[in-house]
Amino acid sequence: MEYNTSELCDMYIDVVDVVEPMFSNYGGCSSFGGAISTVKCFEDNGLIADALQEDGEGKVLLVDGGGSLRRALIDASIAQIAVNNNWEGIIVYGSVRDVDALEELDLGIQALASIPVGAEGNGVGEIELPVNFGGVTFLPGDHIYADNTGVILSPEPLDID
């Protein structure tokens, strides 16, 4: 499904929170949305890989990577796990790598930057907890919508029709 965050803001400005502009699109889908699952980790993507093993239909994985630009939390192999399990997208408050491969995938991916250095895979971090960045608090189960213009958050799914 295609989402236009500008139109959604016009229709639901009193309902949505707008995330501060900081993300760039790295995936093959320019717009995506769904109910969020959260992971909080720092320079370690083991829990991300584990979370993406679950059925992701209608869901977006929101990763609070502490804003680190030193290690990429998402690479082509982790993103492929998301595709294989039907995730709508991944939003990373951190970095990605393998950007040429990421843009070929049928997956929305937004992140702060790219860097060639990979993350540790020890599984250090937390899952399904509230996280805060970009001026917004994200709760598991909230609904997020992203496109090339921006990222917005709603406590309930928005009527797109």
From Swiss-Prot:
UniProt key word ATP-binding: no
Location in the cell: Cytoplasm
GO terms of biological process kind: regulation of RNA metabolic process
GO cellular component, one term: cytoplasm
InterPro entries documented for this protein: RraA (IPR010203), RraA/RraA-like (IPR005493), RraA/RraA-like_sf (IPR036704), RraA_gpbac (IPR014339)
Chief location: cytoplasm
Keyword Glycosyltransferase: no
Keywords, comma-separated and alphabetical: Cytoplasm
Signal sequence extent: none
Family matches, as Pfam families: RraA-like (PF03737)
Alphabetized GO MF terms: endoribonuclease inhibitor activity; enzyme binding
Quaternary context: Homotrimer. Binds to both RNA-binding sites in the C-terminal region of Rne and to RhlB.
Family membership noted in the UniProt record: Belongs to the RraA family.
HAMAP family from the UniProt entry: RraA (MF_00471)
UniProt function note: Globally modulates RNA abundance by binding to RNase E (Rne) and regulating its endonucleolytic activity. Can modulate Rne action in a substrate-dependent manner by altering the composition of the degradosome. Modulates RNA-binding and helicase activities of the degradosome.
Protein name: Regulator of ribonuclease activity A
Record gene name: rraA
